[in-house]
């Protein structure tokens, strides 16, 4: 059987990996009432976290809010102001999803001092809109977010802060990875944590790790939207469902991505004379990617009044905006 664009369809095993969590979710909806938790009344989900998973954290203590704070990332205090602001912004939302209200408010005050009140609030709402599936003032696609990571990496290289991408072993941090392994199961929390650490690893010149976290963040955005539509995005019930379904769903999506990537690589390696149709499709894809990147750059330029050209070019703020330090 042949699928779209001339690719053969994935085998039944790959489809089962995706259908299993969907079937479980439908069964749960039929057998149990919905336990919807409003966004504004979110409690600390870390209190409901299974003890068996808490044992995976770096210490014997239960997972606490301090592990989600940007200052827990090695070298965070030495990062440049703009990447530092963006990482803090994403992790601020992760703390909020986890119910760490005291840490959220303290970090938000620091973000206000660095980026200004209006710009910070707009960006916070924009991130919430991405996760909840609501329309926002600027629709940023996954491709545009990937382009942002690439532009950030290039900017870091131009300032001489980083060189070539570091080897994988130099980018591994057991403590951070242990936190990630646990947090990724939490609805909402794992999404923003992945986005924040994707930016963090990009600034640390760990581009492979950054792409991995960015991909996981993109998958989580779709999963969180599904859970929100089902009304099961909060509370102990939402946590239990997420812990059961999210790993299977992510594994299925990743296998599909890898399958089509392998198919694409195989088609590229074949003689050009037999792939005229695929070349045409590839040309269209390249044009779309270029258009997306141009659109993203245009959005950055058009949003400059929020930031001022100073923060884009030299990381310096307007005199009335406050301190740059976090």
Swiss-Prot record:
Q: What positions does the record give for glycosylation? A: 118, 274
Q: Which GO terms describe its molecular function?
A: cholesterol binding; lipid transporter activity; signaling receptor binding
- Where is this protein primarily located? secreted
Q: Could you tell me the keywords of this UniProt record?
A: Cholesterol metabolism, Glycoprotein, HDL, LDL, Lipid metabolism, Lipid transport, Phosphoprotein, Secreted, Signal, Steroid metabolism, Sterol metabolism, Transport
Q: Name one GO biological process term.
A: lipid transport
The record's account of tissue expression is: Expressed by the liver and secreted in plasma.
Domain of life of the source? Eukaryota
Give the family this protein belongs to, as stated in its UniProt record: Belongs to the apolipoprotein F family.
Name recorded for this polypeptide: Apolipoprotein F
Q: Which organism is it from?
A: Homo sapiens (Human)
């Amino acid at each position: 059987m042949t699928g779209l664009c001339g690719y053969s369809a994935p085998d039944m095993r790959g489809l089962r990996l995706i259908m299993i969590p969907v079937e479980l979710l439908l069964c749960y909806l039929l057998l149990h009432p919905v336990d919807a938790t409003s966004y504004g009344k979110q409690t600390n989900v870390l209190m409901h976290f299974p003890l068996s998973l808490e044992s995976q954290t770096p210490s014997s203590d239960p997972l606490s809010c301090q592990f989600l704070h940007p200052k827990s990332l090695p070298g965070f205090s030495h990062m440049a102001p703009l990447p530092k602001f963006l990482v803090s912004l994403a992790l601020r939302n992760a703390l909020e999803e986890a119910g760490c209200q005291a840490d959220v408010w303290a970090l938000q005050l620091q973000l206000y001092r660095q980026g200004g009140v209006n710009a910070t609030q707009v960006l916070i709402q924009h991130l919430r809109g991405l996760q909840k599936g609501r329309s926002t003032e600027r629709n940023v696609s996954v491709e545009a977010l990937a382009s942002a990571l690439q532009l950030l990496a290039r900017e870091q290289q131009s300032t001489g802060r980083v060189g070539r991408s570091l080897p994988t072993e130099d980018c591994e941090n057991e403590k951070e990875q242990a936190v990630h392994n646990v947090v990724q199961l939490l609805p909402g929390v794992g999404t923003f944590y992945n986005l924040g650490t994707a930016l963090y690893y990009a600034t640390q010149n760990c581009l492979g790790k950054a792409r991995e976290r960015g991909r996981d963040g993109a998958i989580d955005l779709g999963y969180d939207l599904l859970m929100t539509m089902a009304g099961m995005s909060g509370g102990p019930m939402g946590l239990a469902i997420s812990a059961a379904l999210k790993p299977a769903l992510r594994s299925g999506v990743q296998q599909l991505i890898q399958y089509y990537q392998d198919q694409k690589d195989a088609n590229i390696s074949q003689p050009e004379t037999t792939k005229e149709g695929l070349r045409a499709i590839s040309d269209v894809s390249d044009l779309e990617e270029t258009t997306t990147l141009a659109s993203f750059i245009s959005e950055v330029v058009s949003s400059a009044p929020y930031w001022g050209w100073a923060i884009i070019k030299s990381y310096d703020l307007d005199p009335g905006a406050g301190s740059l330090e976090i």
